[in-house]
Structures are given as structure tokens and as C-alpha cells.
């Protein structure tokens, strides 16, 4: 048995994509296999037309291979039961608008999507059974666009059934008068137990994404080399994650100066002693780090080390670095593996 217990089934591949930007969860800016799995389970168990569920934390994922209870708990940590309730098209759209309030409004020049810090991960629901767009150029309450049900525009007076957990039903949909209907069915077991049963029946489970929703109304300047440079600084830990407020290209010069100033202050610990690490610099839109200080610090020690770059370097004698050769532009003839 692994750390999370006995195997409950297996997957054919990882379910969550890599984050493009450190600390900006891919699962909150695009449809993913994790959310489609949860909503599929809810739809199958409830018989509802539409399902809504949240990614309770941005790092929730299912790895490739055997799946245990710890993995299931990671993607669904609360002991919720499932309700089926009647809603109108207008009520469903109002619910979707409530959920989309978690995003900040996009401004011209923003390089990333950011989030209102007042809305934790578990308050952002994603929907299955309908196709829709979220226009982040619009203010809160005006973002849900082009809602389609079975290939046709969803009408405000259209009657639907919705699968939703008991907590969301009571704490939001009813407490905030988003819907008028009451539950017509409640599960006898938890949603987490339903996911366990799904793996028992369907393993190996492949990560499938239907891409039924997307964010529109934004231009993240993905072809602009300035954006690539800033993203490199964020991912290297030289700029803070722009989670609650997007970085904007209008602030490019000051952000670069901030990143380079932080690079000057970084240190590396070698056998318990702090050493200066050399500065970051740029070449053709890529961010590189001079490791000559590190090489000199280790020279003659025979130390092997792990490198985890998040704005710092951790060095521990006896732990081998298993990565690829570290490219050092301008001194390629001296670029060693340090292993």
C-alpha cells in the first residue's frame, strides 16, 4: 500500500495540465480532466441535465498510474452529498455569473488572468452539460456568454435539472436566492464515494476534456517577448505570483528592474554556509542564471546536490542532481552537470 492506502483503480495519464505561470492554477483558467471527471460522476449519479462542481484547491490532480484514497481526497476533500434540483435557464445563468465573479476584470496589457482574493478556490464552480464562455473584459455580473444546451441557445424560461453538492445548494443557491426550486433528490452516499466507485468500475480511467467552456475577451500578449521575459521571472521566483492582480506590460520596465534587483540578493546554502548566487540575465527572451558562484563554492568538495529553482537553490551533500545539463550561454565549454 502507498501513503494514501490500497489501490482503488488507475489512470492512463496525469489529469491536470502544467501551470504556465507559477501559482496561477491551470485548472481555474481552462477546462481540465479533473473537473470533467467530477462533473461526469455527478451527472451519472444524479441523472441531471447540468452539473456544477469546484476545484477545491488549485493543485488538485490525479497522477498517472495507481490511484488510492489519498488521491481521491486530493480532488474532493469535503464529505458532501449530491442534490438534484430544478432550475430555470435564467437561474442557471445567474448561478454561473455568481461563480465567474472570482475573476478580476481583464485590462489592456495584462499578461495573465488573475483572481479576486475574496473568492477562495472552493467558491468557483465549473459546469458540465452546457457550453459557455466567460468574457473577462466585462464587469462582474455581465460575463457569461453564449450558453448552449444540447446545441441550442439556453432560454431563460427553459426548465432544467442541476446536480450540485449540498453545501453549495444551502450556502449559496438558496441563501442568496439564486434559485427558487428545492431539491428533488439527494444521494445516500458522498460524492467522494461516488468517485471511488467510478474508478472501481472504469479503471484504467483516461483523462478526458470536452472543452465545453473557455475564457474570452482577453489578449494575454502571448507573442510579445516582453511577456515571455516576465513569465520567466515569475517562474524563477524573481517576481511574486500575480494571483490577485495581473502584471501589465505598461509596467514592464519597473517589473524587470524589480526582478533583477531580487536576483542580486539571492543566496545559496552550501554545507550550511550562505554563498552569493550570481545574477539572472536574459538572452533572446529566455532567462538564465550564472552558476559560477555555485561552481566555485563546490569546487574540490565532491559534493552532489539537488537543484530546485524557485528563486533559491537548495544544496545537500549526498543527493544527486537528476536534471539535464545546465546551459550557461557564453561559457558553454565550462557547463558541467555538477554531479
Regions found by a protein language model. Give the residues of each.
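Feature captures C-terminal
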Residues: 32, 36-260
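Second-shell loop/turn segments in exported
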Residues: 22-30, 80-83, 179-183, 277-284
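Short, solvent-exposed loop/turn motifs
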Residues: 7, 12-15, 19-23, 131, ...
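Charge-patterned, long linear interaction tracts outside catalytic cores
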Residues: 11, 26-30, 35-36
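Primary recognition of N-terminal secretory signal peptides and signal-anchoring hydrophobic helices
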Residues: 257-339
Amino acid at each position: 500500500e502507498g501513503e494514501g492506502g490500497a489501490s482503488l483503480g488507475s489512470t492512463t495519464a496525469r489529469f491536470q495540465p502544467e501551470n504556465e505561470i507559477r501559482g496561477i492554477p491551470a485548472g481555474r483558467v481552462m477546462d481540465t480532466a479533473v473537473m470533467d471527471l467530477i462533473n461526469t460522476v455527478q451527472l451519472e449519479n444524479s441523472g441531471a441535465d447540468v452539473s456544477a462542481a469546484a476545484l477545491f484547491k488549485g493543485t488538485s490532480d490525479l497522477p498517472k498510474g495507481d490511484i488510492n484514497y489519498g488521491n481521491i481526497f486530493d480532488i474532493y476533500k469535503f464529505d458532501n452529498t449530491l442534490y438534484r434540483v430544478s432550475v430555470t435557464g435564467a437561474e442557471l445563468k445567474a448561478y454561473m455569473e455568481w461563480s465567474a465573479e472570482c475573476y478580476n476584470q481583464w485590462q489592456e496589457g495584462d499578461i495573465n488572468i488573475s483572481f479576486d482574493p475574496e473568492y477562495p478556490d472552493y467558491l468557483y464552480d465549473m459546469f458540465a452539460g452546457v457550453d459557455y464562455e466567460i468574457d473577462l473584459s466585462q464587469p462582474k455580473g455581465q460575463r457569461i456568454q453564449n450558453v448552449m444546451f444540447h446545441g441550442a441557445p439556453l432560454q431563460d424560461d427553459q426548465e432544467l435539472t442541476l446536480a450540485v453538492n449540498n453545501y453549495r445548494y444551502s450556502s449559496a443557491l438558496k441563501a442568496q436566492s439564486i434559485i427558487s426550486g428545492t431539491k428533488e433528490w439527494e444521494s445516500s452516499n458522498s460524492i467522494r464515494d461516488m468517485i471511488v466507485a467510478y474508478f472501481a468500475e472504469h479503471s484504467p480511467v483516461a483523462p478526458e476534456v470536452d472543452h465545453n467552456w473557455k475564457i474570452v475577451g482577453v489578449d494575454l500578449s502571448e507573442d510579445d517577448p516582453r511577456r515571455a521575459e516576465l513569465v520567466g521571472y515569475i517562474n524563477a521566483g524573481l517576481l511574486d505570483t500575480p494571483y490577485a492582480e495581473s502584471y501589465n506590460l505598461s509596467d514592464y520596465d519597473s517589473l524587470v528592474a524589480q526582478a533583477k534587483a531580487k536576483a542580486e540578493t539571492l543566496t545559496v546554502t552550501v554545507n550550511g554556509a550562505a554563498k552569493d548566487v550570481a545574477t539572472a540575465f536574459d538572452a533572446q527572451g529566455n532567462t538564465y542564471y550564472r552558476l559560477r558562484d555555485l561552481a566555485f563554492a563546490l569546487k574540490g568538495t565532491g559534493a552532489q546536490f539537488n537543484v530546485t529553482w524557485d528563486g533559491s537553490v537548495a544544496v545537500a551533500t549526498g543527493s544527486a542532481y537528476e536534471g539535464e545539463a545546465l546551459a550557461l550561454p557564453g561559457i558553454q565549454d565550462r557547463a558541467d552537470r555538477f554531479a
